[in-house]
Regions:
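Conserved short alpha-helical segments that host acidic/polar catalytic motifs at enzyme active sites
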Residues: 1-207, 213-276, 280-281
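Internal, charge-rich low-complexity segments
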Residues: 1-11, 84-86, 90, 94-119, ...
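Generic, well-ordered alpha-helical scaffold segments in large soluble proteins
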Residues: 80, 84, 100-104, 146, ...
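PRPP-dependent phosphoribosyltransferase catalytic core
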Residues: 144, 159-161, 166, 173, ...
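Phosphate/ATP-binding catalytic cores across multiple sugar-kinase/actin-like superfamilies
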Residues: 146-149, 252-273, 286, 291-294, ...
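Terminal amphipathic helices with adjacent charged low-complexity linkers/tails
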Residues: 218-234, 279-314
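Short glycine-rich phosphate-binding loop at a beta-alpha junction
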Residues: 270-283, 401, 495-501
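Extended, hydrophobic alpha-helical segments in both membrane/secreted and soluble proteins
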Residues: 277, 284-291, 295, 329, ...
């Protein structure tokens, strides 16, 4: 970076002086708060970027907030701010959270000011005492009382205190590392391991309902802020979002692939000789590795059986022929690594998917082979229908089997993932199509009235009636219909879609059982309301 190079060249003697660095080089404070964000419920613009800042001339009243979160009850929280005497101008959970924390930060400042004023201190002395004595935990306890959602909330105060608070269900991930010199909190464990070169055992998970609190003087405490509830850590983090180089996530994604083996073998009628295996996108590579390992085990059992059948008639040619059998694995479809269609805004996604994929030619026997391609998830099906299936069809496979390492995504996420609109899910479209095809439209009218009735109840009493839409059909029936909906009219190959089972998901990711987007079982009352 030119700023650092120029600073060192112009001030070689002062460059290693910490106080000089703080005054002259960017990002050299004791506290650093950064965040990577793209729009989920909010917009993709500079105004949506974290951290958010609440300014004040009093040092201890300044506040920066950044977070990985969505709250489901913004309307309720805004009403509470109005009850407190505020007049919010923006309806957004980021601003609402900042103002809630800011309100109780102001109250804590007022309490301490009064306390030290009564002791006879002047205003300058009082400011210093406030900075030493602010009770960050009590501010967070009061601020978070009505929050409903999944969140890891990080904040810094102008005088130098900082905190990171995790939701009581542990929906959003948070990890921390601490030694004599640094304390770091991040949403992903391998990032901490890489930057600080530390062992996995030295990186701890921030407990649900707890806050990591760092005081200006460097003291650290981990304090319970909210009563922890049933752990429902987000399983989609493990399937797709989080880095695949986390030791546990790597193993879990491999298992997700392994659990698909029986369904895949059935789909190809156990004909491995005429089947080619591949994957898309790159994030599916680890799950694909697990799938291949499972297929390999199946092949090895066949080899062992064939060898035993030879008995005394074993010969080198026969043995070589048996041992030469193995799954056919190719990098069939290539994706531009710079493009990620899942996190592209809806208007751009359709145009983008046609530009980012290409295929490897002469890898498939025309009109003979079945082509099996693993994807980590199928949310909208946009990429498959608009681009991937047509591109794969150019290789002239007899059949295309698309397998998802995630179960069918059936319900909206309201805790921080870009899966917010029910009607855009291909699984929802499939269920609605089946209802109409079987003459059961009355179910939809009944559910619509039930949903309206639920919304009249307090959110704590609401149930997710949308689940009834899917109960009429089996998972296999919905998967088959998804295949019908995603198949382009000009596709020559047969098409089959296979999804991970809920059992396979839970067996693979036993510590992350949050599965509301698959099952509709939301961990907070606000989730049912959103659905």
């Amino acid at each position: 970076n030119d700023l650092y190079i120029n600073a060192k060249q112009k001030n070689p003697d002062a460059y290693n002086d910490i106080e000089w660095q703080k005054k002259n080089i960017p990002f050299m404070g004791e506290l650093i708060l950064g965040h990577l964000r793209y729009g989920t419920y909010g917009g993709n613009n500079i105004q949506s970027c974290h951290p958010f800042r609440r300014q004040n001339n009093w040092m201890a009243r300044n506040l920066l907030v950044a977070g990985n979160f969505n709250l489901t009850n913004v309307d309720e929280l805004l009403e509470h701010l109005v009850e407190l005497g505020q007049h919010p101008t923006v309806k957004a959970d980021t601003v609402t959270v900042m103002e809630k924390i800011g309100h109780f930060l102001d109250k804590e400042n007022d309490r301490l000011f009064k306390q030290f004023k009564e002791k006879g201190l002047n205003n300058f002395e009082i400011s210093k005492e406030i900075q030493k004595n602010i009770d960050v935990a009590s501010i967070l306890v009061e601020s978070s009382k009505r929050w409903d959602g999944g969140y890891v909330m990080a904040g810094m105060m102008g005088h130098g205190d900082a905190f990171v608070l995790r939701d009581p269900n542990g929906i959003r991930p948070a990890y921390m590392y601490k030694d004599d010199e640094v304390l770091v909190v991040a949403s992903e464990r391998p990032v901490i391991q890489t930057v600080f070169n530390v062992d996995i055992k030295d990186v701890a998970e921030l407990k649900p309902g707890y806050a990591a609190i760092i005081k200006k003087d460097g003291t650290f405490t981990e304090q319970q802020i909210i009563e922890p509830l049933e752990r429902k850590a987000c399983s989609f983090e493990r399937i797709y979002f989080s880095r695949g180089n986390d030791a546990d996530i790597y193993r879990e994604r491999q298992q997700l692939g392994r659990y698909l083996v029986p369904q895949v073998l059935k789909a190809i009628d156990y004909d491995l000789e005429n089947t080619v295996f591949s994957y898309i996108p790159n994030t599916a590579e680890v799950a694909f590795g697990g799938l291949v390992e499972g297929i390999d085990e199946h092949v090895n059992k066949i080899k062992a059986t064939e060898i035993l059948k030879l008995g005394a008639n074993v010969s080198e040619p026969k043995l070589s022929q048996i041992l030469s059998s193995h799954p056919r694995i190719h990098k069939i479809i290539l994706k531009d690594a710079k493009q990620r269609t899942f996190i592209t805004d809806d208007e751009s996604r359709d145009n983008l998917v046609n530009l980012v994929y290409d295929i490897t030619y002469e890898t498939v026997k025309k009109d003979v082979d079945t082509l099996v391609v693993l994807d980590d998830s199928i949310v909208r099906g946009t990429t498959l229908k608009q681009s991937i299936l047509r591109i794969l069809d150019r290789l002239h496979p007899k059949k295309i089997v698309i397998i998802s390492s995630a179960p069918q995504i059936r319900y909206p996420d309201c805790y921080g993932i870009d899966m917010a609109i029910l009607s855009k899910f291909i699984a929802f479209d499939a269920a609605i199509s089946l209802i109409k095809e079987t003459g059961k439209e009355s179910i939809l009218n009944s559910l619509y009235e039930k949903a309206k009735a639920e919304l009249l109840k307090p959110k704590e009493e609401q149930i997710n009636v949308v689940q009834e839409i899917y109960r009429t059909f089996t998972n296999e029936e919905i998967s088959e219909k998804i295949g019908d909906l995603l198949k382009p009219k000009d596709l020559k190959a047969d098409l089959q879609i296979i999804y991970q089972t809920i059992e396979g998901l839970h067996q693979s990711c036993p510590d992350n059982l949050g599965d509301w987007y698959f099952t509709g079982n939301y961990p907070t009352p606000g989730g049912n309301k959103v659905a």
